[in-house]
Curated annotation (Swiss-Prot):
Its EC number is 4.2.3.4. This is 3-dehydroquinate synthase. The gene is aroB. Catalyzes the conversion of 3-deoxy-D-arabino-heptulosonate 7-phosphate (DAHP) to dehydroquinate (DHQ). One of its GO terms (molecular function) is nucleotide binding. GO terms for biological process: amino acid biosynthetic process; aromatic amino acid family biosynthetic process; chorismate biosynthetic process. Pathway: Metabolic intermediate biosynthesis; chorismate biosynthesis; chorismate from D-erythrose 4-phosphate and phosphoenolpyruvate: step 2/7. It comes from Francisella tularensis subsp. tularensis (strain WY96-3418). Its main location: cytoplasm. It comes from the Bacteria.
Amino acid sequence: MISKLSVNPTFSPSYNIIVDSVLDFSHILEYVTNKQVLVVTNTTVAKLYLTKFLAALVDDLDVRTCILEDGEQYKSQQSLDKILSTLLENHFTRNSTVLVALGGGVIGDITGFAAAIYQRGIDFIQIPTTLLSQVDSSVGGKTAINHQLGKNMIGAFYQPKVVYTSIEFYKTLSQREYIAGMAEVVKYAFISKDFYLWLDSNRDKILAKDSVTLIEMVKRSCQIKAQVVAMDEKELTGARAILNFGHTFGHAIEKCQNYRGLKHGEAVGVGMAQAIDFSHYLGLISQQQAKDFNDFIVSFGISIDFPNDICQKEFLEAMLLDKKNSNKELKFILIENIGSLSLQKQSKNELEQFLDISR
């Protein structure tokens, strides 16, 4: 069973997202029109899927691999340099090269950024292997590496040629990784009331990993993101900002833990709860709404407990570095109801007072 949908960005060419019930890498062959292929993956995914992927490629291609260490802390300049050096050392050229990102969000982000900057832009293909990367980072063209002072601070908007994925990847995905991915899925429920109701009525099947339900879940999640990206590909109008619900707080958590604590999806889960509580603090929603929204997050196995190893001063400093901020104004994605999120400016003083009472 294959589900296919199209992403139509504002400025870039359209591309397909292919969600498969089985794992059949041959579906991407029609998109590999280049003769030089560099497969970027990590040590974990390489052991599981690299051999099968390489076997699916035709014989007349010049195929090389670049295997990075696994973990958010390796979404770095050093890893980027390794990819670029591999391309240069093997004389890969702009018009004959395609990069393939075989892995989760870190691999997709760093490979996409390498594609964006190598010889001013080469083709790349996304093969996301985690639930989180399937529904979020592989769609929409955000590519980046981290800086020691902040997450995703060095990057570009650059769209893939195609996204291919399969729910069969879940067989080798830990329960922790699966639940981390569910946080990004739940994020879309706060953006779309229809999806909120669908998730609510299909919770048991989702937690039981029913294959038909999961394909529909991934498809619906990608559709919501694709619709937003079509309106505001490069975050010029502010429409795309709602996709960052939970991320302002979440990114700060990751930064404070040096990307070695909570996984990205876990941090987003906590971040959404923080954004919900901040919305209540500001009077945008009632106490009962805040409880209902947080209970909805928790009902999918997602923890909303704030880590106890984070210093409030350091956390506040990390939030001040958020990319949405401008002219020293703090900007947050806040909630007024299901399907009603908005980008709002708040003062540093308001945030400090909220953090004081919420810790």
